[in-house]
Amino acid sequence: METVITTTIIASAILLAVAALGTALGFAILGGKFLESSARQPELASSLQIKMFIVAGLLDAISMIAVGIALLFIFANPFIDLLK
C-alpha cells in the first residue's frame, strides 16, 4: 500500500513539473511571437493583444487542470481502493 502511495505522489510531482514547464514555454513562445508580430504590423497590435490574452488563458488552464488532477491523486487516491 505504501508503494502505491509513494508512486502516486512521485507521479503527481512529475505531472506538476511537466505542466509548469509546458506553461512556461508556452508563455515564452506566445510573448515572443506577439512582440514580433506587433513590431511587424503595429496597426494590428490591439487585435493581436486580445487574441494573445485568450491564448494565455488557455495556457493557464492547462496548469490549473494539472494541479486539480495532482490534488485528486494525492488526497483522494482512487488506486488505494483497488488494493482492498
From Swiss-Prot:
Gene3D superfamilies: F1F0 ATP synthase subunit C. The chain crosses the membrane at residues 9-29, 54-74. It is a multi-pass membrane protein. The keyword Ion transport applies. One of its GO terms (molecular function) is proton-transporting ATP synthase activity, rotational mechanism. Pfam families: ATP-synt_C. Its main location: membrane. F(1)F(0) ATP synthase produces ATP from ADP in the presence of a proton or sodium gradient. F-type ATPases consist of two structural domains, F(1) containing the extramembraneous catalytic core and F(0) containing the membrane proton channel, linked together by a central stalk and a peripheral stalk. During catalysis, ATP synthesis in the catalytic domain of F(1) is coupled via a rotary mechanism of the central stalk subunits to proton translocation. HAMAP family: ATP_synth_c_bact. This is ATP synthase subunit c. It comes from Pasteurella multocida (strain Pm70).
